[in-house]
Amino acid sequence: KMYDVVRVSEKKLIGEIIELRGDKASIQVYEETGGLGPGETVESTGVPLSVELAPGLIEGIFDGIQRPLTRIAAAYGDRITRGISVTNLDHEKEWEFVPLAREGDEVQAGDFLGYVQETPIVRHKIMVPYGVAGKVTYIRGGMYNITQTVAKIATQKGEREICMLTRWPVRRGRPYREKMSPEMPMIT
């Protein structure tokens, strides 16, 4: 499928389908392709190129496809080895989740469920994911990693567990209710 992430050759290089013509695909490989040739195996992941949005994003240093350069350097050395596979954000690190919503609240996409104080000046808001609306049936503060459930929402399609991690396709714009003009610049 167009824009799906693929793994190329036995080295599992990261690529993306950028053109389809019949049963042939053109693939943009995001790593060094030396030594590759026609007929290499290609395995589709079935998902589009996406980024992980969660606490830990602000403190990280990433390459263009959100590979965590500091974690890669710690595990593999200063050179990025071809075909390595690591999670974009640290899925094990725990963050203190502070609830803003309460059980019984009616919420919809973009509403704040709580926050994580990611840095002394950055408060990372945890929002109701796109496409989710309903009543908060569970929400608890405490220490969680980004994949653990911090809230549950009863929707028309059943109960939905909410964690602090959202994966978002890079080629799809983020929805918003209104555009807010900046009140003061963030000087870094």
Regions from the language model: what does each represent?
Residues K1, A25-E31, H91-R102, K135-I139:
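Short alpha-helix capping/helix-loop boundary micro-motifs
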